[in-house]
Amino acid sequence: MKLPKEGDFITIQSYKHDGEIHRTWRDTMVLKTTENAIIGVNNHTLVTENDGRRWVTREPAIVYFHKKYWFNIIAMIRENGVSYYCNLASPYVLDNEALKYIDYDLDVKVFADGEKRLLDVDEYERHRKAMKYSDDIDFILKENVKILVDWINNQRGPFSPAYVNIWYKRYLELRSR
């Protein structure tokens, strides 16, 4: 598939390990595409849950997906600062339909004040048994939690204040065209 260009809109689909669709985001605007990463923005984006429920994102969020790391990052721009929601997930694949990845339940939330929390550990353990995650996947995910925490602690990539400012500014420029 041809890579999306700056200003294009794509669909994002999250799946579970068993192949069931988990969640879909419609019309994520692409801000940058490289060989290994896609940066986009969601702002009042329609989200559809696997049970059919729908909702719209409340605030602008810069999204970061990578082909080598087992996580994706959502930087939510709020009045009280930027907070992050990080999904432990497979590297993304892109086809003619959507950007797709497998959500592996574990999440890291970073609050605007810098507090970090590992979320959904019980759900991860339950799904790991029920969906038979391999020992290799379990190891990879736990190693990627360490990488993610290192990025957070060192303000690397999406966790750099300059990163969010640059990409949000670019979004505003593209939106006003």
UniProtKB/Swiss-Prot annotation:
Family matches, as PANTHER family: PTHR39159, UPF0374 PROTEIN YGAC (PTHR39159:SF1)
Protein origin, superkingdom: Bacteria
Gene3D superfamilies per UniProt: FomD-like (2.40.380.10)
Protein name stated in the entry: Nucleoside triphosphate/diphosphate phosphatase
S-S bonds: none
Cofactor: Mg(2+)
EC number: 3.6.1.15, 3.6.1.6
Top EC class, one word: hydrolase
Keywords assigned by UniProt, alphabetized: Hydrolase, Magnesium, Metal-binding
Residues binding Mg(2+) 2, per UniProt: 105, 107, 120, 123
NCBIfam families found in the cross-reference section: PRK13662.1
Source organism of this protein record: Streptococcus suis (strain 05ZYH33)
HAMAP family registered for this protein in UniProt: Ntdp
Protein residues bound to Mg(2+) 1: 87, 103, 107
SUPFAM superfamilies in the record: FomD-like
Catalysed conversion reaction: a ribonucleoside 5'-triphosphate + H2O = a ribonucleoside 5'-diphosphate + phosphate + H(+); a ribonucleoside 5'-diphosphate + H2O = a ribonucleoside 5'-phosphate + phosphate + H(+)
Protein purpose: Has nucleoside phosphatase activity towards nucleoside triphosphates and nucleoside diphosphates.
Active site positions: 23
Family according to the record: Belongs to the Ntdp family.
Single GO term (MF): ribonucleoside triphosphate phosphatase activity
